[in-house]
């Protein structure tokens, strides 16, 4: 029982340490840089590299300016045509189930 309490305490401390950055506002984080140029070091010259790629990179440039949270949200909203194909491909399974149920009901 004592070991369980120690493990729970260690787990709670680790959880608190790892989640500390997620619940604090950016202004309270001590290690986080602040100011208008604070995030320049994350992706230095990235839009410049896209400009050199040519006109095919126009869509990539728009996605890069949008930011990754918006990109993930946009991608999660999209559904591809494969869902419709899968539903059409497995439609026969429903027919097989219904015909088996009808066969069980006959005397």
UniProtKB/Swiss-Prot annotation:
Which residues would be cut away as propeptide?
22-61, 99-107
Q: Where is this region: Disordered?
A: 26-65
Modification sites for Phenylalanine amide: 95
Predominant location category: secreted
The question of whether Lipid metabolism is a record keyword is answered with no
Keyword list (alphabetical) reads:
Amidation, Cleavage on pair of basic residues, Hormone, Phosphoprotein, Pyrrolidone carboxylic acid, Secreted, Signal
Q: Where are the transmembrane segments?
A: none
List of residues that carry Phosphoserine = 99
The answer, when asked if Phosphoprotein is one of the entry's keywords, is: yes
Q: Tell me where it resides.
A: Secreted
* Modification note: Neither gastrin is sulfated.
Pyrrolidone carboxylic acid sites (modified residues): 62, 79
Q: Which GO terms describe its biological process?
A: G protein-coupled receptor signaling pathway; response to food
* UniProt function note: Gastrin stimulates the stomach mucosa to produce and secrete hydrochloric acid and the pancreas to secrete its digestive enzymes. It also stimulates smooth muscle contraction and increases blood circulation and water secretion in the stomach and intestine.
Record-stated family: Belongs to the gastrin/cholecystokinin family.
Q: Tell me what this protein is called.
A: Gastrin
From the broadest rank down, the organism's phylogenetic lineage runs:
Eukaryota, Metazoa, Chordata, Craniata, Vertebrata
Gene name as annotated: GAST
């Amino acid at each position: 029982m004592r070991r369980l309490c120690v493990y729970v305490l260690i787990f709670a401390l680790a959880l608190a340490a790892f989640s500390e950055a997620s619940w604090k506002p950016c202004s309270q984080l001590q290690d986080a840089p602040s100011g208008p140029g604070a995030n320049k070091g994350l992706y230095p010259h990235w839009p410049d590299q896209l400009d050199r790629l040519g006109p095919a990179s126009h869509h990539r440039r728009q996605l890069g300016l949008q930011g990754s949270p918006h990109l993930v949200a946009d991608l999660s909203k999209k559904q591809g045509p494969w869902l419709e194909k899968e539903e059409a491909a497995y439609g026969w399974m429903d027919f097989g189930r219904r015909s088996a149920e009808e066969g069980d009901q006959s005397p």
